A protein has these predicted regions:
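Positively charged n-region of N-terminal signal peptides that target proteins for export
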Residues: 1-4
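C-terminal motif of bacterial Sec signal peptides marking the signal peptidase cleavage site
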Residues: 14-17
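N-terminal pro-sequences and low-complexity stem/linker regions of secreted or lumenal proteins
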Residues: 19-471
């Protein structure tokens, strides 16, 4: 673990060399979190809100929020039979039968449709029995001879041994079994919800991006840098999807709220430009603003460097490469080790006592889940996805049974850092307060064992591949 004296000494050198603030704060500025510039005698950060910041959730103890987003897994698929969590042994079918959930590899070559239409088929008016009707297909990355289609396929779960780092994190800290994907569709709109609490196409519009963006002959797109002719299907309040727009939007974002508060953000992604998972590229004022070229960072492994060198921003999103994504049909099984690498980097750094880490999955990926999601409108809420909460103040060995959604992560960030509300789904969401005990002393970090070291991910070639066979 790097010592504070190391950070301070480096900061002195940097302060001497630099006459003005760069796009990334100095090490001392960043280690002493940016809503504070000093620590009180108690060790709690003092902020512009006053000593110990009593108005903030956590009293100012949390000054960094990291949102790690993986891909396409339902709760029942990834945490089957997790102790004290609500999981199922059997799944219902549209034929009135039951299917015993069965183990399937994380690297299973078949992908399951997870469009909004597929949600409606599987949800089946609240019966939760249409999963056997979901379409599956073999990924183009796979040997077609390894694919065996079946209406049982969506009822699979990933064995614990394949995702052991996730189970270790969930066991040591908090696992939420009532975390619902806010939207009822695939990755592109889901990532918009994770930064804006909505996928509306403009501030005053009720139309929401509902599907992945595509262009004929160009595969998966998404964002203001999308190829000419790219469109995304939108959904109206009545549930109609009969209108397409270019996927470049004008609306609020958490990045904007962070900047307004004088704090910092970084969005780490595999590649720059358009992409299904590259959420900032689809928000016009971010894409064409001054911070895009400094705060949207590629490749995603730079987060490890920034943590190690004291350049962690106040709010951080971390998205994966295709191989490390957990996305069915295209991943290579390295996702759990990738997430653990980021968590371990924070845990071994001076940031640990001031950071909250949220690990979630952007959508359910078509996989079975037995819990009926609440329905607020024509596009919210979607099926359950896992949420792991990791922090020195996270409750130990705790399963949260309270209802959460993507807006809950946004609301937690607003309330811990003193940000203005987005006025979207964060308003109705809870703040994840049940997952923390801020009156307790910060826990020491315990390394998460992994099969792959961080150097494995840092040595991978930069790739601009999204799962453009998403369907």
């Amino acid at each position: 673990m790097r010592k504070l004296t190391f950070f301070l000494s480096i900061a002195v050198l940097m302060a001497t060399a630099c006459g003005q603030r760069s796009s990334s704060p100095s090490l001392s500025q960043e280690f002493i979190p940016q809503i504070s510039r000093s620590f009180g005698a108690s060790g709690i950060a003092t902020t512009r809100y006053g000593a110990a910041a009593p108005s903030l959730l956590g009293g100012g103890k949390i000054t960094h929020v990291i949102i790690i987003v993986q891909e396409n897994r339902s709760f029942d698929n990834l945490f089957h039979k997790f102790p004290h969590a609500d999981s199922a042994d059997y799944g219902e079918t549209s034929k009135g039968g039951r299917v015993k959930l069965f183990p399937e590899r994380l690297t299973e070559p078949m992908d399951i449709s997870h469009t909004h239409d597929s949600f409606e088929v599987e949800y089946n008016g609240g019966k939760m029995d249409g999963f056997n009707l979901a379409q599956s297909r073999c990924s183009k990355d796979q040997d077609q001879g390894t694919c065996h289609n079946s209406d049982r396929h969506p009822y699979g779960y990933v064995p614990r041994w394949e995702v052991e780092p996730y189970w270790v994190m969930a066991s040591q800290y908090v696992l939420a079994d009532r975390m619902f994907q806010t939207n009822e569709g695939p990755s592109f709109p889901a990532h918009q919800y994770l930064v804006s609490g909505t996928s509306t196409i403009s501030i005053h519009s009720t139309l929401r991006a509902a599907e992945n963006a595509h262009v004929t002959g160009g595969g998966g797109q998404g964002g203001c840098d999308s190829l000419t002719g790219t469109t995304v299907r939108v959904i109206d309040d009545d549930g109609n999807e009969n209108h397409d727009v270019f996927p470049c939007f004008t609306r609020v974002s958490l990045m904007g709220r962070v900047a307004e508060a004088g704090l910092t953000w970084h969005y780490y992604q595999a590649h720059l430009g358009h992409g299904i998972w590259n959420a900032p590229d689809a928000i016009r004022n971010i894409r064409y603003g001054t911070l895009y070229h400094t705060d949207v960072v590629a490749p995603q492994t730079k987060v490890l460097h920034d943590i190690a060198h004291g350049n962690l921003a106040n709010v951080v999103w971390v998205t994966p490469t295709k191989p490390a994504s957990d996305h069915a049909g295209v991943n290579n099984g390295s996702g759990p080790a990738w997430v653990a690498s980021v968590v371990n980097a924070v845990g071994e750094s001076p940031y640990w006592n001031h950071t909250a880490i949220f690990v979630t999955w952007d959508d359910w990926g078509g996989w079975y889940d037995h819990v009926k999601p609440p329905q607020y409108n024509s596009y919210e809420l979607g099926f359950r996805v896992p949420l792991i909460v990791i922090s020195a103040y996270a409750r130990a060995h705790y399963v949260s049974h309270r209802q959460h959604e993507f807006g809950s992560i946004l609301k937690f960030t607003e309330k811990t850092l003193g940000l203005g509300t987005l006025g979207t789904t964060d308003v109705r969401s809870d703040d994840l307060g049940d997952c923390f005990n801020f009156s307790a002393k910060p826990r020491r970090f315990k390394m998460i064992p992994t099969a792959l070291p961080p150097s494995y991910f840092e040595s991978q070639p930069i790739s601009n591949q999204d799962p453009d066979d998403d369907f």
